[in-house]
Each structure stands twice: as C-alpha cells, then as structure tokens.
Curated annotation (Swiss-Prot):
EC number annotated for this UniProt entry: 1.1.98.-
Catalysis performed (reactions): oxidized coenzyme F420-(gamma-L-Glu)(n) + a quinol + H(+) = reduced coenzyme F420-(gamma-L-Glu)(n) + a quinone
One Gene Ontology cellular component: peptidoglycan-based cell wall
Family: Belongs to the F420H(2)-dependent quinone reductase family.
Protein name as annotated: F420H(2)-dependent quinone reductase Rv1558
Keyword Ligase assigned: no
Keyword annotations from UniProtKB, A to Z: Oxidoreductase
Function statement: Involved in a F420-dependent anti-oxidant mechanism that protects M.tuberculosis against oxidative stress and bactericidal agents. Catalyzes the F420H(2)-dependent two-electron reduction of quinones to dihydroquinones, thereby preventing the formation of cytotoxic semiquinones obtained by the one-electron reduction pathway.
Gene3D superfamilies: Electron Transport, Fmn-binding Protein, Chain A
Organism (species): Mycobacterium tuberculosis (strain ATCC 25618 / H37Rv)
Length: 148
C-alpha cells in the first residue's frame, strides 16, 4: 500500500526542484544528476509524520536497491536517514516505476558489497567517506509483497 499523508517539500532548493520535476513528469524527467540515474525516495518524517521526497543516486543490483546516507560527507547523517530508521517502510520511484519497500541498514560484509556497488555508480561516495569521521550508512530495500 503506498505511503499516504501530507507532503512537505524539502527546504533545499535543488532537492525540492528535482523531486517536483520527477513527480510532475511521472518519472520521465528529473531522473538524472550529473548524467547519472537517480531514484526518488519517499519517507515518513521522524518528527512530523509528513511525507518527504528525496532524490538519491540509483544503486541497484539484480532488481534490489540500496540507498546511501552520505550527505556529501557531512559530519551528520542526512535528515532522511532518521526518517528511515524510525519508519523503515519507504516508497521508491525508479523512473516511471514505483514500489513500496522495507529498508534495512546493512553492516559488515553485506555493507562492503553494497558500498562497492554504490561507489561504482557514484565514485564521489569514496571521497565523501574520507571527509567524515562517521561511517556512511547504507540501507538495502526489500520489496513489500501485496498485502504486506
């Protein structure tokens, strides 16, 4: 079942504008950042309960997705990280296809595998990690089955 509730646009201009373009076009526009594919992640706000939409780099392998909470290597995790921790049911739009997923933070060997995949898609992730003392979180998304 798709997430429902009041939508609160991002306070960040670039994020809000890309999310708006993605949504208004039905996923036919706004699907790239610097020539690389992006997905649109919808989360439920940890504090507000409002829907938040965030464009993120598309990290996909054999039909499974991962999301990387890099925030460009900032000292703190992005706001959406806290939303996903509190409310792990998310919606992901990849182009014109939208689905519901359960997000699970990964660690150890599983994280290492997904980190390599993420860096292969967006090499800047590697430099982001060197800029921060925190370990950049990675979540793997599992599709929610009908009725789940």
């Amino acid at each position: 079942m798709p997430l429902s509730g009041e939508y609160a646009p991002s306070p960040l201009d670039w994020s809000r504008e890309q999310a708006d373009t993605y949504m208004k076009s039905g996923g036919t526009e706004g699907t790239q950042l610097q020539g690389k594919p992006v997905i649109l992640l919808t989360t439920v706000g940890a504090k507000t309960g409002k829907l938040r939409k965030t464009p993120l780099m598309r990290v996909e392998h054999d039909g499974q997705y991962a999301i990387v909470a890099s925030l460009g290597g900032a000292p703190k995790n992005p706001v959406w990280y806290h939303n996903v921790v509190k409310n792990p049911r998310v919606e992901l739009q990849d182009g014109t296809v939208t689905g519901d997923y359960d997000a699970r933070e990964v660690f150890g060997d599983e994280k290492a595998i997904w980190w390599q995949r993420a860096v292969a898609v967006w090499p800047d992730y590697a430099s982001y990690q060197t800029k921060t003392d925190r370990q950049i979180p990675v979540f793997v998304l599992t599709p929610v089955r009908a009725g789940g």
